[in-house]
Amino acid sequence: MSKRLLILEDGTIFEGEALGANLDVTGELVFNTGMTGYQESITDQSYNGQILTFTYPIVGNYGVNRDDYESIHPTCKAVVVHEAARRPSNWRMQMSFDEFLKSKNIPGITGVDTRAITKIVREHGTMKASLVQARDEVDHQMSQLQATVLPTNQVETSSTATAYPSPNTGRKVVVVDFGLKHSILRELSKRECNLTVVPYNTSAKEILEMEPDGVMLTNGPGDPTDVPEAIEMIKEVQGKIPIFGICLGHQLFSLANGATTYKMKFGHRGFNHAVREVATGRIDFTSQNHGYAVSSENLPEDLMITHVEINDNSVEGVRHKYFPAFSVQFHPDAAPGPHDASYLFDDFMDLMDNFKK
């Protein structure tokens, strides 16, 4: 295998072996602590523009299959692993991890100390990084990295460009796609919801004209303040139709009601984040993937905190006191991860049914 370098913004350089597509890329370096679920993570649009480091020591041992995609066209910049499995085996497997990365034009690096990389990010925060072929001109590559300005509003490249239906016989739900995970559609479809998926910039007028029973605000990448049109849409829709927001949808719903958001030092990315429900004390283990959070300081009077993360006490869920609307920062759809919080989809069904009475 040819050699590659992972160059960090702080000047640290890791050398390893090439994996996946033959590309030089620059992105935001983040880490995921999950032990499995690499296919779902890489195809999660929330990683748009990011270099994804897996902390688990071996990745790819069960290959890649046709069922576990969260999106067909992944947008993460690159992947970093300590060891890529060379002899994967699973009855569902269609291709190896390396073949999958090549098919999706995603470069990677293996044979590096991913726990050392994670420690740097934990101590210094997320930072820019470049994955390049090992050459002599490292100083030039470093200067290029320092000069690179990462793009904003990744939602634009993660959302569907046109509306499309996913028909069923039950409640009519408009799903606003900010970087939709397929597992959200699966959870709604299991409950027989008649779905229409719309682009992120769909207006409130267009949504209201569809006369839905509810609106789902999905997950997605980046800074929620980069999507002002969605914030305005939520302001106009709430109170007229029940709303359920997940991940980025949670942040946008909170901003629409006067809350503020902030960039976290290194975010929550993994499948074992413990979340406490404030009202009952119930603890759920959740799947999370976000670098921004809703601030608990000066939270608007109209919102109440429903869930908090037990390690850093960050806001993990809010509910509107007067409108039929709530949101959570974690992924109740899991995929991958625990299904402790899947009951929230049932709460959304009840919210729509009660609103119609």
Curated annotation (Swiss-Prot):
Pathway entry: Amino-acid biosynthesis; L-arginine biosynthesis; carbamoyl phosphate from bicarbonate: step 1/1; Pyrimidine metabolism; UMP biosynthesis via de novo pathway; (S)-dihydroorotate from bicarbonate: step 1/3
GO molecular function: ATP binding; carbamoyl-phosphate synthase (glutamine-hydrolyzing) activity; glutaminase activity
Top EC class for this record: ligase
Domain Glutamine amidotransferase type-1: from-to ranges: 172-357
One GO process term, biological-process aspect: 'de novo' UMP biosynthetic process
Binding site for L-glutamine: 46, 220, 222, 248, 251, 289, 291-292
Assembly and oligomerization: Composed of two chains; the small (or glutamine) chain promotes the hydrolysis of glutamine to ammonia, which is used by the large (or ammonia) chain to synthesize carbamoyl phosphate. Tetramer of heterodimers (alpha,beta)4.
Protein family: Belongs to the CarA family.
PANTHER family per record: CARBAMOYL-PHOSPHATE SYNTHASE SMALL CHAIN (PTHR43418:SF7), MULTIFUNCTIONAL TRYPTOPHAN BIOSYNTHESIS PROTEIN-RELATED (PTHR43418)
Descriptive protein name: Carbamoyl phosphate synthase small chain
